[in-house]
Swiss-Prot record:
InterPro entries per UniProt: Aldolase_TIM (IPR013785), CBS_dom (IPR000644), CBS_dom_sf (IPR046342), IMP_DH (IPR005990), IMP_DH/GMP_Rdtase_CS (IPR015875), IMP_DH_GMPRt (IPR001093)
Entry annotated with the keyword Hydrolase: no
GO biological process: GMP biosynthetic process
Catalytic center residues: C335 (thioimidate intermediate)
EC number: 1.1.1.205
Organism: Saccharomyces cerevisiae (strain ATCC 204508 / S288c)
Cofactor annotation: K(+)
Family classification: Belongs to the IMPDH/GMPR family.
GO CC field: cytoplasm
Pathway: Purine metabolism; XMP biosynthesis via de novo pathway; XMP from IMP: step 1/1
Ranges for domain CBS: 121-183, 184-240
Amino acids binding NAD(+): D278, S279, S280, G328, M329, G330
Record protein name field: Putative inosine-5'-monophosphate dehydrogenase 1
GO molecular function: IMP dehydrogenase activity; metal ion binding
Length: 403
């Protein structure tokens, strides 16, 4: 019988072992030895937990220049992401990509709904004239969904501010022929042009009003802050927002045909933050040309290209200017590419190989498809830097997320 070792030497013994338990990620994902692995083809060995869960940060790069607080996005499918899902994905620290299975105008309209849900400084507020009737003001409430409007001397933006009208001013007025100037709040509290967003929010807290109107030195209306946006900030402090406008971040998908160029123009005009080039095979001359055109036409727009499953595919898209990659072929909830075309790659191997390559160029990746159970997240995240793009998994949880 072997001698019993001193328990104090247990750690020293592990250091002298020829190799640690299990396989390294490089050994596990060696395609020459193991071919391709799906998520349920392996398990992750446990290790030492020497930190509290509160110390864990899920902050992850979506693209070269966009960072979110959670590594979750919703897929650009017509059964998954429209304006409501995109709004709540952004509020809950992720991002949603609005599908393009609709007219360009309808897609741009969905985009505007997301963008208008929350604002920083509202630089193009809807204003009315002092000679507008109460009846017309009530109609504007029904049209826009709110009843608070700045009143300027000529009813135009960037004109002399003469008052403000709210729902309280007109709620009990029965004579709809009265003019706004007869019922409006005169001399509303204002902020001076140049105040910061945080300074403006502090004023809103003190005055306990629905809006803060910002004017220049001549008293002309410049912009506006809304109390409802302040309340949204308190409820969703980590919401995904544009660094410039403080509006919610959102993305959208387009195809790679010439007709998609005009669609993209409409989306950019509506405030697009990041675009997905939606294709099951991203390594095509059509997508490469589209990436180059976008970079020339809209150099500040972030592009997520794909889908890819190999390093060679990734290399072409990175060289063309992609700011992020989407990984997966035949692994989505309704995708049948592998069965019909005998083309694709098991998602575990695809994710590791593409991420390992793309990370060398600072290009983040997202795994698209293959999530069947909650533990699939852990498989996706080992040794890699990327997001999870969910489609069918989200559909059954839609009301839980958005309600």
């Amino acid at each position: 019988m072997a001698a019993i070792r001193d328990y104090k030497t247990a750690l020293d013994l592990t250091k002298s072992l020829p190799r640690p338990d299990g396989l390294s990620v490089q050994e596990l994902m060696d395609s020459k030895i193991r071919g391709g692995l799906a998520y349920n083809d392996f398990l992750i060995l446990p290790g030492l937990v020497d930190f509290a869960s509160s110390e864990v940060s899920l902050q992850t790069k979506l693209t070269r220049n966009i960072t979110l607080n959670i590594p979750l996005v919703s897929s650009p499918m017509d059964t998954v992401t429209e304006s409501e899902m995109a709004t709540f994905m952004a509020l809950l620290d992720g991002i949603g990509f609005i599908h393009h299975n609709c007219t360009p105008e309808d897609q741009a309209d969905m985009v505007r709904r997301v963008k208008n849900y929350e604002n920083g400084f509202i630089n193009n507020p809807i204003v009315i004239s002092p000679t507008t009737t109460v009846g017309e003001a009530k109609s504007m409430k029904e049209k826009y969904g709110f009843a608070g409007f700045p009143v300027t001397a000529d009813g135009k933006r960037n004109a002399k501010l003469v008052g403000a009208i709210t729902s309280r001013d007109i709620q009990f007025v029965e004579d709809n022929s009265l003019l706004v100037q007869d019922v409006m709040t005169k001399n509303p509290v204002t902020g001076a042009q140049g105040i910061t967003l945080s300074e403006g929010n502090e004023i809103l807290k003190k005055i306990k009003k629905g809006r803060l109107l910002v004017v220049d030195e001549k008293g002309n209306l410049v912009s506006m802050l809304s109390r409802t946006d302040l309340m949204k900030n308190q409820k969703y402090p980590l919401a995904s927002k544009s660094a410039n406008t403080k509006q919610l971040l959102w993305g959208a998908s387009i195809g790679t045909m010439d007709a998609d160029k005009e669609r993209l123009r409409l989306l950019v005009k509506a405030g697009l933050d990041v675009v997905i080039l939606d294709s099951s095979q991203g390594n095509s001359i059509f997508q490469l040309n589209m990436i180059k055109w976008i970079k020339e036409t809209f150099p500040d727009l972030e592009i997520i290209a794909g889908n890819v499953v190999t390093k060679e595919q990734a290399a072409n898209l990175i060289a063309a200017g992609a700011d992020g990659l989407r990984i997966g072929m035949g692994t989505g909830s309704i995708c049948i590419t592998q069965k019909v075309m005998a083309c694709g790659r098991p998602q575990g191997t695809a994710v590791y190989n593409v991420c390992e390559f793309a990370n060398q160029f600072g290009v983040p990746c997202m795994a698209d498809g293959g999530v069947q159970k909650h533990w699939s997240y852990y498989y996706q995240s080992f040794g890699s830097w990327f997001f999870y793009c969910y489609d069918g998994w989200y559909v059954g949880r839609y009301y839980r997320i958005t309600r």
